[in-house]
A protein has these predicted regions:
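Short S/T/G/P-rich N-terminal loop/turn motif that feeds into the first structured element of a domain
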Residues: 10-82, 86, 90-97, 123-126
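Surface-exposed loop/turn and secondary-structure junction residues enriched for glycine/proline
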Residues: 84, 101, 117-118
Length: 126
């Protein structure tokens, strides 16, 4: 019985080794985007497509997370942004190189007309 439970659990949580990445705690780059027109579905689709293409082609980004805010239920939670992005790097130098790489610059050029505000928080891991 335990063997069966273990086999089922392993199957449920297994991930494709080609797509699984290990979170790199050395340097995290967290970006929040506020769109001019957050309800623009065409703009959102263009942003998501361009962002995913950029992250796939980045030479420096180790792991990434793209998110949207859940409806806040507490006063301390800010749900005013349109998208969040968390990207990890193996060093601050890699993050600096990422800022100037072609894939990143192309993403900015393709999508800069969509946002009215961008806020970045960079952090070193402890």
């Amino acid at each position: 019985m335990l063997l069966l439970v273990g086999a089922i659990s392993g199957t449920c949580f297994a991930q494709d080794g080609n797509t699984m990445k290990t979170f790199d705690p050395a340097f995290a780059h967290t970006v929040y985007f506020w769109f001019k027109n957050p309800g623009d579905t065409d703009g959102r689709a263009r942003f998501e497509s361009s962002l995913k293409k950029f992250l796939k082609n980045s030479k420096y980004a180790k792991t990434d997370f793209i998110g949207i805010p859940p409806k806040a239920t507490r006063d301390v939670v800010d749900d005013s942004y349109t998208y969040s992005l968390i990207v990890t790097f193996d060093s601050a130098e890699s993050q600096e190189n990422y800022q100037n790489e072609e894939a990143h610059l192309l993403f900015i050029e393709e999508c800069k007309d969509l946002w009215e505000r961008v806020v970045v928080y960079d952090s070193f891991g402890l």
